[in-house]
Design a protein with these regions (language model features):
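Switch II (G3) loop of P-loop NTPases
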Residues: 36-38, 56-72, 78-106
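Generic secondary-structure signature for well-ordered alpha-helical cores
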Residues: 8, 78, 82-86, 139-142, ...
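Phosphate-binding loop that captures ATP/GTP phosphates
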Residues: 6-63, 74, 81
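Conserved catalytic-core segment of NTP-binding enzymes
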Residues: 90-91, 97-187, 193-196
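Gly/Ala-rich phosphate-binding loop of Rossmann-like dinucleotide-binding domains
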Residues: 3, 7, 108
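NTP-binding/hydrolysis catalytic cores, primarily Walker-type P-loop NTPases
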Residues: 179-182, 189-221
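Amphipathic alpha-helical transducer elements in NTP-driven molecular machines
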Residues: 22, 70, 74-78, 124-131, ...
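Flexible glycine-/small-residue-rich
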Residues: 17, 47, 55-58, 96, ...
Length: 221
């Protein structure tokens, strides 16, 4: 949805689904039945809503499980970076799986990242996993710019009367940011009709903060 917000604003946006074992971007964008075409020796991304997308889900059968070890995962990430005709982009979002493993290290190796945006939900199990991800990205041997953290499914808002129900607990994301010294970018609520349109204000606010931080980082490089 952050990619959608930037594309709607006129930016040239790419979205790489780096979750090799559990790719979800094609399902979220309703492109799971499409297949990439070739342009010479390069694959052409699947374009949807102004976003150039690539995912392992485009390349394998829907029910096929990829039981791959680290070297195969790293090779797949390398090919997504070098064998896809991304073209000239303003932003490339990389959707990573949870955890701290080979895929994350491969992305850092193959793509010069401008920064990292973390997403968590409020409950302690998710916050604990996100805490480990922060530790990885702040490791001196990896050292990535931390843009900040988004808390998804922060509260349930059944209607427009403003009343909020904190189903999964309250404040986990903010507390984690305070501990780690990173910025809290905002909350995404659960709504009965959770569409891009009725959450667009949330995404615009968060995207604005991300773009501002990226601009500051670029100016300081």
């Amino acid at each position: 949805n952050l990619a959608k917000t930037l594309a709607k604003a006129g930016a040239k946006v790419g979205l790489l689904d780096a979750d090799i074992h559990g790719p979800s971007i094609p399902t979220l964008l309703n492109t799971k039945d499409r297949k990439p075409l070739m342009d010479g020796e390069l694959m052409k991304p699947i374009e949807v809503e102004g976003i150039q997308t690539m995912s392992m889900a485009y390349l394998v059968e829907r029910k096929q499980a990829l039981v791959w070890r680290g070297p195969m995962l790293s090779k797949a990430i390398s090919q997504f970076c070098s064998d896809v005709k991304w073209g000239s982009l303003d932003y490339l979002f990389v959707d990573l799986p949870p955890g701290t493993g080979d895929i994350h290290l491969s992305i850092i190796q193959h793509i010069p990242l401008s920064g990292v945006v973390l997403v968590t939900t409020p409950e302690e199990v998710a916050v604990s996993d996100t805490r480990k991800a922060i530790d990885m990205f702040q490791n001196p041997h990896i050292a990535q710019n931390m843009i900040g953290l988004i808390e998804n499914m922060s509260f349930f808002q059944p209607n427009d009367d403003g009343k909020k129900y904190y189903i999964f607990g309250q404040g986990g994301g903010q507390q984690l940011c305070d501990e780690a010294g990173i910025d809290f970018l905002g909350e995404i609520p659960i709504k009965e009709n959770k569409t891009f349109a009725n959450l667009e204000a949330n995404y615009l606010s968060i995207t604005g903060k991300i773009v501002q931080k990226l601009s500051i980082l670029a100016a300081n490089q």
